[in-house]
């Protein structure tokens, strides 16, 4: 550590001054740079760093991320009496949850008879039978309660004429186990449901004594003796380091859409949580399953909600034809997202695309009444005008499949506990570590997520993390002890990147990664392209050692932050493309031209009774686990079984079958 440059004295003085301000406002809510009343102490442990100011904190629980899942976990913990720190790299209401448009699924039955068991069936089918049915059982059963809870918090749902929560049609949703036609299950706030949900949860969190650490960048988890004991974070405002100790840590950092060139994700969606977990030698799960949303605005990538099709919009090709009935005769434009994205891509590949280059299709809305567009899709009308120059009451929107969601993430059980496997392949709980939302893989989405199940995932499993922690721990218990040098490796990495003086800039290397992933891990994949992508990504990963950071400061250093984020993105991208190349089948969002069939342990086109089950190494209905092994980006893969059992006898397992819409 002797080569680390010493922080200027003015920075140390600023850090002390900020702590004095924190003490002065200790009677107020702990917020922003406030260090949490009596839980913080000034420190500069020689064993970590003699150069960087360090502040130690002790809490009952830590939540990393303040989107929907993080906020729901945080105030759920505080409600149970746990002193909770919320660490977030941006203000809570800027979290990407705000970008969700269409709605949140729950079998309320406001539009017609509905049942959560039908919702469960649709979710298992939508996952292409890769989803864990105990977790899907839990989520869909809890869904009606979760939505009513949101309503009680004040979430301003759109209403029917008789005052009930309005529910629209959404892709892959059916009645009577797929035999009763289209379901209207998606509870909506016009086309701004995520915005409303995030503000509702944030407002609710302010009713509780959550300790917010806003614009703090989580650098790494702190592990000792095989258990998670805290988090090391960088205060972006003054450059101080903060070491948080707690018996329980919840990862709620969202996805990593920014590993791709065209995506609907905010620039902050950089997979920080999955990368932090990977650096502790723990696996990520099913990262090869990346959802392409059918309707991103052509050329911009901005999301156009599936709710447009739920309200009666439909897709047309360059010849003006409605083409989805060729691919999904029953559901048509409301087939599952992977089906619609592939259908659009086929239309374009076969020369029926729209525009001068015939490289996109159209979403038509102008046949809908202007009043319906104004009331149910006001945000889309605005977005289409800004980003495509289109008046939706007069002309169609040019659209193209765009990276939207990561089905994979940190593997967890349905209680939110992070899991790994032992040498016998059995699930093992990682003590002290939880995950929820897009950062997690519980796995309720399997190989493909149904639209409007993501917001449901956030609130159900954010709450589940809080409940599990409350069941297993008592508030006010002593925080775990740490070794004097806990976090030392993370500080060394920070300092190394801060003073990196290589040949390639962060922006240039990030662009190379994004274009490689976009081309080599797209809607359709095949062996040679995937293998080429694996080779290219390995070289890009190695080039990170030659990164150049221009800004050496510690105060609002966006160059340094983007470099830390790129380090996280590279880990996620590498695991994604290696896992995709290894999976020799087509399932859900993973569609291979050279392996077009789904490979289950049984022949799912026939009755399962009497069939011999294939060994695990002869089929692909299994979860991929991926580990980052070293600084060169080498990836190790293993697999774990899909959970087919439900939580109890109130609902039966959904057996694998042909998936058609």
UniProtKB/Swiss-Prot annotation:
GO terms for molecular function: electron transfer activity; flavin adenine dinucleotide binding; succinate dehydrogenase (quinone) activity. Gene3D superfamilies: FAD/NAD(P)-binding domain (3.50.50.60), Fumarate reductase/succinate dehydrogenase flavoprotein-like, C-terminal domain (1.20.58.100), succinate dehydrogenase protein domain (4.10.80.40), Succinate dehydrogenase/fumarate reductase flavoprotein, catalytic domain (3.90.700.10). It is an enzyme of class 1 (oxidoreductase). Its cofactor is FAD. The keyword Flavoprotein applies. Keywords: Electron transport, FAD, Flavoprotein, Membrane, Mitochondrion, Mitochondrion inner membrane, Oxidoreductase, Transit peptide, Transport, Tricarboxylic acid cycle. Disulfide bonds: none annotated. Substrate binds at residues 293, 305, 404, 449. The modification Tele-8alpha-FAD histidine is found at residue 96. FAD binds at residues 65-70, 88-103, 272, 438, 454-455. It is found in: Mitochondrion inner membrane. Pathway: Carbohydrate metabolism; tricarboxylic acid cycle; fumarate from succinate (eukaryal route): step 1/1. It comes from the Eukaryota. Flavoprotein (FP) subunit of succinate dehydrogenase (SDH) that is involved in complex II of the mitochondrial electron transport chain and is responsible for transferring electrons from succinate to ubiquinone (coenzyme Q). Maintaining electron transport chain function is required to prevent neurodegenerative changes seen in both early- and late-onset disorders. This is Succinate dehydrogenase [ubiquinone] flavoprotein subunit, mitochondrial.
């Amino acid at each position: 550590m002797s080569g680390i440059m010493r922080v200027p004295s003015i920075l140390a003085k600023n850090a002390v001054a900020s702590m004095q301000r924190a003490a002065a406002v200790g009677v107020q809510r702990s917020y922003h740079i406030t260090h949490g009343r009596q839980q913080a102490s000034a420190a500069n442990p020689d064993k970590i760093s003699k150069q960087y100011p360090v502040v130690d904190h002790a809490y009952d629980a830590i939540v990393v991320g303040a989107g929907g899942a993080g906020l729901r976990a945080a105030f759920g913990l505080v409600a149970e009496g746990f002193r909770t720190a919320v660490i977030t790299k941006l203000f809570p209401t800027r979290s990407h949850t705000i970008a969700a448009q269409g709605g949140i699924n729950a079998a309320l039955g406001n539009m017609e008879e509905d049942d959560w068991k039908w919702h469960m069936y649709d979710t298992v089918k939508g996952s292409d039978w890769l989803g864990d049915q105990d977790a899907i059982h839990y989520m869909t059963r809890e869904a009606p309660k979760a939505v009513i809870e949101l309503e009680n918090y004040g979430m301003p749902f759109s209403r029917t004429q008789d005052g009930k929560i309005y529910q629209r049609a959404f892709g892959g949703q059916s009645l009577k186990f797929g035999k009763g036609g289209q379901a209207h299950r998606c509870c909506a706030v016009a086309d701004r449901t995520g915005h409303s949900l995030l503000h509702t949860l944030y407002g609710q969190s302010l009713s509780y004594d959550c300790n917010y650490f806003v614009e703090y960048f989580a650098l790494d988890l702190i592990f000792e003796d095989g258990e998670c004991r805290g988090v090391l974070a960088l205060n972006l405002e003054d450059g101080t380091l903060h070491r948080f100790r707690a018996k329980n840590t919840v990862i709620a950092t969202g996805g990593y859409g920014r590993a791709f060139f065209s995506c609907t994700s905010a620039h902050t969606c950089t997979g920080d949580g999955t990368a932090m977990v990977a650096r502790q030698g723990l696996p990520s799960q099913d990262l090869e399953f990346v959802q392409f949303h059918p309707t991103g605005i052509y050329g911009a990538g901005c999301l156009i909600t599936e709710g447009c099709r739920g309200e009666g919009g439909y897709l047309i090709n360059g010849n003006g034809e409605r083409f989805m009935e060729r691919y999904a005769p029953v559901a048509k434009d409301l087939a599952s997202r992977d089906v619609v994205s592939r259908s659009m891509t086929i239309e374009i590949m076969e020369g029926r695309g729209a525009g001068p280059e015939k490289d996109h299709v159209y979403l038509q809305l102008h046949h809908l009444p202007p009043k319906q567009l104004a009331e149910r899709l006001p945000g889309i009308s605005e977005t289409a005008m800004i980003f495509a120059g289109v008046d939706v009451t007069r002309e169609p929107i040019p659209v193209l499949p765009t990276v939207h969601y990561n089905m994979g993430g940190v593997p967890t059980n349905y209680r939110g506990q992070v899991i790994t496997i032992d040498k016998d392949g059995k699930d093992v709980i990682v003590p002290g570590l939880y995950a929820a939302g897009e950062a997690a893989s519980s796995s309720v989405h399997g190989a493909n997520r149904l639209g409007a199940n993501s917001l449901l995932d956030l609130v159900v499993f954010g709450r589940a993390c809080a409940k599990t922690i409350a069941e297993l721990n008592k508030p006010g218990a002593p925080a775990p002890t740490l070794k004097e040098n806990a976090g030392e490796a993370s500080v060394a990495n920070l300092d190394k990147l801060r003073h990196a003086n290589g040949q390639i800039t962060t922006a240039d290397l990030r662009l190379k990664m994004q274009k490689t992933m976009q081309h080599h891990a797209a809607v359709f994949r095949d062996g040679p392209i995937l293998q080429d992508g694996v080779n290219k990504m390995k070289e890009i990963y190695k080039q990170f050692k030659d990164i150049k950071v221009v800004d050496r400061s510690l105060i609002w250093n966006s160059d340094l932050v983007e470099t830390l984020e790129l380090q996280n993105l590279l880990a996620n991208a590498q695991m994604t493309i290696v896992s995709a190349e290894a999976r020799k089948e087509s399932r859900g969002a993973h569609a291979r031209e050279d392996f077009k069939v789904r490979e289950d342990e049984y022949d799912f086109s026939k009755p399962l009774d009497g069939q011999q089950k294939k060994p695990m190494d002869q089929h692909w209905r299994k979860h991929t686990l991926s580990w980052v092994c070293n600084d060169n980006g080498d990836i190790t893969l293993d697999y774990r079984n899909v959970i087919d059992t439900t939580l109890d006898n109130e609902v039966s397992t959904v057996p694998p079958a042909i998936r058609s819409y």
